[in-house]
Amino acid sequence: MVTVEEYRKAQRAEGPATILAIGTSTPSNCVDQSTYPDYYFRITNSEHKTELKEKFKRMCDKSMIKKRYMHLTEEILKENPNMCAYMAPSLDARQDIVVVEVPKLGKEAAQKAIKEWGQPKSKITHLVFCTTSGVDMPGCDYQLAKLLGLRPSVKRLMMYQQGCFAGGTVLRLAKDLAENNKGARVLVVCSEITAVTFRGPSESHLDSLVGQALFGDGAAAIIMGSDPIIGVERPLFELVSAAQTLVPDSEGAIDGHLREVGLTFHLLKDVPGLISKNIEKSLLEAFQPLGISDWNSLFWIAHPGGPAILDQVELKLGLKQEKLRATREVLSNYGNMSSACVLFILDEMRKASTKEGLGTTGEGLEWGVLFGFGPGLTVETVVLHSVAT
């Protein structure tokens, strides 16, 4: 008879959790940021609010976003006028859209990741699904498992309503699952659709307008596992450590409330200032054990909550401009897709690194950091190790 210790040892993987594939998807409807203010004020019947429209134009101009993708088309919004009002009961209409479309968008990203991975989907042992868009029972995890035809024995974990830091959270959870279950292959999916947050403008709620200027739709999927099969699976990044912390004195800095009117967002404090003031502490805790203190020696993946956050982090840490290139590229081409953003950035980085012949998946560098920022204020810090290209 085996002992508990022997059994536990046999259960655990030997090597670190490794990202083995990445896939992304967006709705087909692409929105040009330069013309979005005119469209937004027209579709919400707010063209008479000329001063507010000028403010919104400035927000869009400063956003550093060129385009975004949105499931909500003009046709859908015309069929659901309450979604175009500032605060009209509209949760049913919103939910009806997202409970179908969130798993569907997630499926597209997952299929791309599975194709790159090159293994049969029957080898997927765990599924982690994350969204801030829509709640049903059974949830998006169940719907996605059905859409993909995963085994009934797949161990599912559903994460709802976490917000923008959750791209880091899912990596932390998947890391623990992969490393503590020998042979586990974890499918992680973040799928976000702004149908829950879209609403008309109001002079009394400018922070809501900030969200309307920044948020976009997208889904990203990764396959994670330890001890990749040599010659069969191709590692992209290794996950070395993962931590979560609450920023001091930041309660109420970012709030979201799911009510009859949908999901409303409130930005109450200086979020970029709070993040930049506290980010070095997270970096020191993560990298001191590795003997790393030069932040420019790392490759960077930071959740692009908005350009102000990126600018202040750059300034505070003395980062060279190219450090946040992949992050800014994703913000420019997709907007803020909440939890999915950091996975899009990982994808952008490894593709650009290979294309430019930089030697590793992390822009030619060995060590990197991934940050998730969101409600709480919560900061997720993931230490990454790149792989030779």
Swiss-Prot record:
Catalytic reactions on record: (E)-4-coumaroyl-CoA + 3 malonyl-CoA + 3 H(+) = 2',4,4',6'-tetrahydroxychalcone + 3 CO2 + 4 CoA
Sorted UniProt keywords: Acyltransferase, Flavonoid biosynthesis, Transferase
GO terms of biological process kind: flavonoid biosynthetic process; polyketide biosynthetic process
Class of this enzyme: transferase
EC number: 2.3.1.74
Active site: 164
Pfam families, sorted: Chal_sti_synt_C (PF02797), Chal_sti_synt_N (PF00195)
PROSITE patterns on file: CHALCONE_SYNTH
Pathway involvement of the protein, from the record: Secondary metabolite biosynthesis; flavonoid biosynthesis
Protein name according to UniProt: Chalcone synthase 1B
Organism (species): Solanum tuberosum (Potato)
Organism classification: Eukaryota, Viridiplantae, Streptophyta, Embryophyta, Tracheophyta
Gene transcribed to yield this protein: CHS1B
